[in-house]
Amino acid sequence: MRTLSLPLALTARISPVVVLAAAGWALTSGPAATPAAQKESAPRAADETPSGASTAAASKAFSTSPAPCGSISAATIKSLVPGAKTAGKEIPSTDTALRRTCSWNALKGYDYRWLDVSFEITESDQAAAKSYKENIAEKSGGGSVPGVGDAGYSVVNLTTEDKQQTREGVVMIQASNALVTVTYNGSDFESKKAPSTDEINKGAIRAAKEAVKALESGQRT
């Protein structure tokens, strides 16, 4: 098998922990977007009011974040990130009661995959809904994810750096006063291509559903 030099995108993605730790709390967005970035996904979803949001002024279902590295099943990790250690790696947070993130990544042959799941616990349903709407307003394209939490949104982007494609999916879910964000991306460093939009989108949504289930099955206030 011929030897291929890996582009800068791989180096940046294999060791993201230091960068995220310095930030304290950040939603990963994959390799830096370039002017060649393309937005792709289902049609844009209309702004939705979370159907299950409480009308109480300061309603709050969750008081702490669940253990993020235990929120995704080993079977799902093996499927989405072949070759990764199923235990994952938790990224340091300034307040683990309110914000926690776990990541998994692996290079198997020339196929690279990255997955992370983040939980943020806000002071109320209303605060979570506001943050959710602000986050999706910053995105372009995308569509709703029905049947998960109170509101859900998914978007898939394609970026190209050093002629290497990377496709990344981001799923954001609001569940009561909690926000769950999943980032899933991949690249093929032999073909220089990226996995299909369908593969990345379905993988991110699969992980998001498991993360929300772990949140909801945990301790409530």
State where each predicted segment sits.
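A small/polar (G/S/T-enriched), proline-flanked helix-loop surface module common
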Residues: T3-V17, G24-T221
